[in-house]
């Protein structure tokens, strides 16, 4: 008797949880910034960086969490950056939820150098033990095994 009730309860909880995510309403200010940002294509370009700073200033933590699942990779990455900047305690959980976010990439600009990065890679490096300012960044001991898991080099055969 307990098992059908438990299954029903879990299913109902999941259904409510999913419906809340789809019906989540961003504030008017956040919507405007996200709309502007979603037209950009390069992270760290001067235009998109200014929009990121606006997003950091207007979006609540809940909105940023929601935006880490946005359809545009640049919005997902900047929302993740903003959560790192705000020292969101569950930032690693969000990273792990993006382990399979490897289909789309983002263009990243560093001065005159431009490159592409998978969303998962971008988020992983945002938690780098040396360069991240987040309280919840990885330690070197935590970082290295994850790095090896995702980015191990194929050794040439002799």
Task: Describe the predicted segments one by one.
Residues 72-87:
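Short N-proximal segments of mature Sec-exported proteins
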Residues 1-26:
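Bacterial Sec-dependent N-terminal signal peptides
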Residues 30, 57-67, 88-100:
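Amphipathic alpha-helical scaffolding segments comprising HEAT/armadillo-like alpha-solenoid repeats
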Residues 45-48, 76:
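Residue-level detector of extended alpha-helical repeat arrays and alpha-solenoid scaffolds
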């Amino acid at each position: 008797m307990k098992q059908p009730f438990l299954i029903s309860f879990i299913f109902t909880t999941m259904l409510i949880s999913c419906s809340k995510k789809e019906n989540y309403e961003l504030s008017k200010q956040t919507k405007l910034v996200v709309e502007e940002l979603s037209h950009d294509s390069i992270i760290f370009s001067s235009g998109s960086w200014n929009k990121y700073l606006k997003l950091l200033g207007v979006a609540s933590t809940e909105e940023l969490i929601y935006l880490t699942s946005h359809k545009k990779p640049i919005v997902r990455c900047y929302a993740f950056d903003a959560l790192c900047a705000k020292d969101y305690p569950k930032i690693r959980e969000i990273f792990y939820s993006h382990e399979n976010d490897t289909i789309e990439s983002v263009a990243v600009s560093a001065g005159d150098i431009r490159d592409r990065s998978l969303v998962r890679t971008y988020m992983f490096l945002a938690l780098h033990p040396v360069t991240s300012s987040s309280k919840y960044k990885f330690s070197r001991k935590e970082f290295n095994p994850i790095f090896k898991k995702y980015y191990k080099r194929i050794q040439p055969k002799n």
